[in-house]
Amino acid sequence: MASVFKIHSAYQPAGDQVKAIQNIADSFQKGEKKVTLVGVTGSGKTFTMAQVIQNLGLPTLVLSHNKTLAAQLFREFKEFFPENAVEYFVSYYDYYQPEAYVPSSDTFIEKDSSINEEIDKLRLRATSSLLEREDVVIVSSVSCIYGLGSPEEYTNSVVALKVGDTIERDTVIRKLLHIQYNRNDLDFSRGNFRVRGDSIEIYPAYHTDGIRIEFFGDEIDSISRINPVTAQTIFKLEKAYIYPAKHFITSGPKVKEAVENIRAEVDAQTDFFRKNNKLLEAERILSRTNYDMEMLQEMGYCNGIENYSRHLTGRKPGERPACLIDYFQGEFLLIVDESHVTIPQIGGMFAGDRARKQTLVDFGFRLPSALDNRPLNFQEFETLTPRTLYVSATPAEYEIEKSSKVVEQIIRPTGLLDPIVDVRPTKNQIEDLLVEIRKRIDAGERVLVTTLTKKMSEDLTDYYEEIGLKVAYLHSEVETLDRVGIIRDLRKGIYDVLIGINLLREGLDIPEVSLVAILDADKEGFLRNYKSLIQTIGRAARNVNGTAILYADKTTDSMAKAIEETKRRRKIQEDHNLKFGITPLTIKKEVGDIIEREEKERTSEDLVLEDVEKKFNSKKFPNKEVLKEKLREEMMKAAKELDFERAAILRDKMLSIQTEDSSAKN
């Protein structure tokens, strides 16, 4: 039977990929539940994953341990499966301060957050795709184990409309309001709808196009997909399914029942506090909960509504909440990327969440039922994901022990060797590194530098900036979409050097990087253990000139083991290349936005950039010297007119051309 997935790629499986794909697919088809793929950096693990997905033909959840790598995988899978639904599901918070109480200082910290609308749209699109089709690949962070609205409520709330259906216009309006759409006849934006005579125009919360429903009396006369900006018809539809604008949907009767149960719980908790002479806590929980219940009854919503999710969804005490995994219908495949990091992260989520909320419960800020608004614990996660492929260059003991088969993928189809590892003393490491960076810049290549502390990263970035290097600092406070933008800018040559702490290890795919520098490599610990060193060294394995410099005054056991393993893998690849006459080549990969941003959400900078690309390109100016001069003139003109944003973009364009020239010369 033909697979519902179809890979689009100019390449065929090669090297160890052929055997790995066959072994993994055969294992799952025989009924085996857990398999581990041990694949070195640059061996094409993502391509192997895609081939396994195509062979099995199952909906797939790809789990990554951070948003940056999830975004990279999302882009790669979209390229492999352009005809299928590839979706992205990560936390939609740009900023999140959870509710907390610090007893030692009697400080209550209110929840504060900022939601990224683009990621919210992608999350909603992910769940709608799971309910609509079978050919779905969802790339997710650990957000997939956190509470989400019930899939049953979500499915039951879908508004199904078909040409020829008899239904009153006002009934459709009421249904849209129930699934959290807002009527706004002036602002036609995501999650809103407007009414124009005998038609309703809806802007789905998960889509880039709008939908127009036209009525003739009480009958649906036509349904169209429309451009939300111009309102012009794109094409006609026979039917349309409008999915809720929010994941948390609750019917009126359930709210009434939930309020009764919450009031019963608050009475019991108040009695408990009073019996234990905790009068302040008793008054606190009573007043806070009463206020929330009034809001819930009047508005259907209250701040911190997620803390009442157990009652609103009718779950029993201790019962796990619904999550993204529950939206998969029937059999599916879970792929855990960089499993040696992702698996421990899943295990740690529950304990951290529980500790914070227990304090809130103990001091009367939340009811005990708030503890059930939580991520899955590890046992629940294992139960929900029976068919799992673990993928890592350095799998942990857990993955190896759980797997019925461990498949190695050492040989790279490109012939690329593992990087040369050079150990140097820490004395004058910054100046020594500067010399190496300049060599790479002259060759048109890029550099990653990893430090031990945030302060050292910041100081090093400032120092290199002062002496004229194009350098960026990648850290945890950079927003998700900006983080992937920095990586794109490094690849394009806007930056030559990227400095970070622990964000430069697993999975970062930058073929232009020929040097990875690890400062203080002999400081044994989480960031300098064997697995971390192997992963960091591997960042230079996608370039034919790949080198890793470890600055250290002694060789630790972790360093010795990592260097030995790198040499072993290098020898295997060298022998393969010699046997088949393969010449190593740097991976060629198109530079593009990892996550496409929508037309309406482009910033002024995007528009200026588009204008510059349109007016100043190699087609209009084939001679690069003429193009650079035109860019310089336009840059000076923009600066004179105080349009510094345009001037900066023109400067970056000019620098990018200069970088291309120096690369070509070398």
Swiss-Prot record:
Location of the Helicase C-terminal domain:
429-591
SMART domains to which the protein is assigned, alphabetical: DEXDc, HELICc
Please list the residue ranges annotated as the UVR domain: 625-660
**Main localization (coarse):** cytoplasm
Query: Which amino acids does the record list as binding ATP?
Result: 39-46
- Which biological processes are named by the entry's GO terms? nucleotide-excision repair, DNA damage recognition; SOS response
**Gene Ontology CC:** cytoplasm; excinuclease repair complex
UniProt function note? The UvrABC repair system catalyzes the recognition and processing of DNA lesions. A damage recognition complex composed of 2 UvrA and 2 UvrB subunits scans DNA for abnormalities. Upon binding of the UvrA(2)B(2) complex to a putative damaged site, the DNA wraps around one UvrB monomer. DNA wrap is dependent on ATP binding by UvrB and probably causes local melting of the DNA helix, facilitating insertion of UvrB beta-hairpin between the DNA strands. Then UvrB probes one DNA strand for the presence of a lesion.
Which family, according to the similarity comment? Belongs to the UvrB family.
**Designated name of the protein:** UvrABC system protein B
Gene that produces this protein:
uvrB
